[in-house]
Design a protein with these regions (language model features):
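Short loop/turn elements that form and flank the Walker-type P-loop nucleotide-binding site
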Residues: 65-66, 111-112, 164
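Conserved catalytic core of Hanks-type protein kinase domains
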Residues: 27, 50, 74, 119-120, ...
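NTP-dependent small-molecule kinase module
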Residues: 124-203
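ATP-dependent small-molecule kinase phosphotransfer cores
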Residues: 6-108, 182
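Residues at the C-termini of beta-strands that transition into short coil/loop
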Residues: 14, 120, 174
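Short, small-residue-biased leader/transition segments that mark boundaries at the very start
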Residues: 1-4
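A glycine- and Lys/Arg-enriched "phosphate-lid" helix/loop adjacent to the NTP-binding pocket
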Residues: 77-157
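Hydrophobic/aromatic beta-strand patches that form the interior of the parallel beta-sheet core
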Residues: 11, 71, 115-117, 169-171
Length: 203
């Protein structure tokens, strides 16, 4: 149908090839503190927002304004979860999320997503996958977030809050078999679920 005639562009964040991402690299490498709590969410979020703004302004603003479809691999939504977990208090979390929405979508003028698909990977599976992966930012050790198990547990729990608050679409990436071991779903299966969400948005 007409969907195949629509222009589509994919973007990924952080954009490590951009000079705008340099503070993020420093942050993830632990140059501002080795613990995830050493940099408060408002400061950390500002770094990521600048990276997204630089990408938007230099790479895809005109394309987007001309009706192009943007598929983002991580976006403001990733920042929400990774920073909100630094607050235990619900009021502080809510205040931060309210601030972040205003900061990026109003002050910075970044486009608000029409839909968010959460690719939901069980924590025990994702930790195995991370152990096998060499991190983009810090060699075999990943980054300061990924080395902290308690932090990853908190992040996984926080996704539940965000799914409810923003009506995100949860896409399971693994199935639990009778043996209680998880099996990864195929790329095609995951793609079909994501496409089902997108199809409903297209005119």
């Amino acid at each position: 149908g007409d969907v195949y005639k629509r222009q589509v562009k994919s973007v990924s964040f952080p954009n490590y090839d951009s000079g705008a991402a340099m503070p993020i690299k420093m942050y993830l490498a632990g140059e501002f503190g080795k613990d995830v709590h050493d940099v408060n969410p408002y400061v950390a979020s500002s770094m990521y927002a600048i990276d997204r703004f630089a990408s938007f302004r230099t790479d895809w603003e005109q394309f987007y304004n001309n009706g192009g479809i943007i598929i983002a691999d991580r976006y403001t939504t990733s920042n929400m979860v990774h920073q909100m977990v630094k607050y235990d208090d619900l009021k502080e979390r809510t205040a931060f999320l309210d601030w972040l929405e205003d900061f990026e979508f109003q002050k910075f003028g970044l486009p608000k997503p029409d839909a968010v698909c959460l690719l939901d990977m069980p924590l025990e599976v994702s930790e195995v996958l991370m152990a096998e992966r060499t991190g983009k930012t810090g060699g075999n050790t990943g980054d300061i977030h990924e080395g902290n198990h308690a932090y990853l547990v908190a992040v996984h729990d926080a996704y539940e809050e965000l799914v409810k608050r923003y009506q995100w679409h949860r896409i399971p990436c693994a199935d639990k078999a009778k043996s209680s071991q998880y099996t990864l779903r195929t790329i095609e299966e995951i793609h079909n679920d994501v496409y089902g969400v997108v199809e409903n948005l297209l005119p």
